[in-house]
Amino acid sequence: MKKFRTIALATLFAGNAMALDNVPESGFSWVGFAGMTVSNLKSAGLDPKMGVTFGAKVEYMLPSAYGTYLSAGIDWVHKGARDTYFNPTLNTDETFKVQAHYLEIPIHVGYRYNISDELGVYGEFGPYFAVGVTGKGKNKYEDLPDEHFMWFGKKYMWGNQKGIQRFDCGIGFRVGAEYKNMYSLTFGYDWGITDIYVDDYRTANPGLPKLKNRNMSLTFGYRF
């Protein structure tokens, strides 16, 4: 029995020592990334649209926190949506497309676990804050000239009334894996919680459902 206790204690201490060896080092680091997005507009009944994203973030691995870290970044995110349907008013098929480019600042808290000296996995979540930089849309008709419009600004698809605001915010998460503490592959998803219709437009059209951004991303990163 004494021999068994000795072996058990030795195994426990060895496991703890190995776990401590794999704890990430504390301090700051930078990560640059680029990849693809699949986005949509909730409650609009539209189809998702593919886009691109790129940016950089700074991470601070907290000391004596066993893998807990804070991160903040600045991302360029391409969002949008599309749909194809029959327009009974114009008696023709219509394809609606919108592209919106946002500058986003995600602020996350995360946890990283190093499986070995070369491979680590991580997950993080938190809010994001975004501003629409540019956006455009198009109504493409089968038998009529195409109609182009600005997504942000006074000229909107429903006349000259400003309909879409530039500000957006929401919450999101990221999960991924990193190789040799340099190369990473990350999957993310963001839920917009802001109704992006302008208040005046919402008041003038009370029957409209709330319009919110949804965005999924897959990115490759490099740690500096």
What is each residue range found by the language model?
Residues 20-59, 141-143, 221-224:
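Short glycine/proline- and aromatic-enriched beta-strand/turn motifs that initiate or cap beta-hairpins
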Residues 42-48, 82-91, 135-146, 197-204:
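Outer-membrane beta-barrel translocator domains and adjoining extracellular loop/strand segments
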Residues 34-36, 54-60, 74-76, 105-111, ...:
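Residues on the lipid-exposed face of transmembrane beta-strands in outer-membrane beta-barrel proteins
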Residues 1-27:
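Cleavable N-terminal export/targeting peptides
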Residues 75-79, 160-163, 168-224:
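Predominantly the C-terminal beta-signal and adjacent terminal strand-loop region
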Residues 65-68, 119, 181-187:
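Repeated loop/turn-to-beta-strand initiation elements of outer-membrane beta-barrel proteins
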Residues 26-28, 48-52, 99-105, 119, ...:
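Residues that define the transmembrane beta-barrel architecture of outer-membrane proteins
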Residues 37-41, 77-81, 128-134, 190-196:
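Structural signature of outer-membrane beta-barrel domains
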